[in-house]
Amino acid sequence: MMKDWNLNLYDELVFCGYGEPTERLDDLLTIARKVKATTHLKIRINTNGLSDLINGKPTAPLLKGVIDSVSVSLNECSAEEYNALCHPKFGPDAYDAMLQFTKDVKNYVPHVAMSVVGVIPRDHIEKCRDIAAELKVPFRVR
């Protein structure tokens, strides 16, 4: 199917959207490897950071050499606020797993950042900015 697309018209391929791209991690990696081998494109994943919980194993090492950047949706400044906003199917373990994934993926992917949506309270945004700074990753309000 990809042979019909002129991917050279683009600079970056982003795996994101309504739903979590790492729910289909094997497919994501297969496509990313093929794109990497046949184009100049940079490859980014926009993720909720719950890939390890979703896949039942550490997943950050699988991204090495395949993914150029990862943007993790931090979403909130505490586990309680995160759970209230996101309702993760993994319950109270989700927030810490997302933070751990962010720490881990920095060892395998050249560019890692965190983001929040600008509709949460300003003081929460600033706390999120501090969390990203503690993790030594760029922070963006979207």
Protein language model features and the residues they cover:
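Conserved Radical SAM active-site core
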Residues: 1-66, 78
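A cross-domain feature marking catalytic cores of carbohydrate-active enzymes
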Residues: 17, 45-49, 74, 116-118, ...
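Surface-exposed amphipathic alpha-helices with a cationic face
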Residues: 29-39, 102-110, 129, 133
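Conserved strand-turn element in the central/C-terminal portion of the radical SAM core barrel
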Residues: 46-52, 87-89, 101-124, 128
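Non-cysteine beta-strand/loop elements that form the S-adenosyl-L-methionine
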Residues: 66-78, 140-142
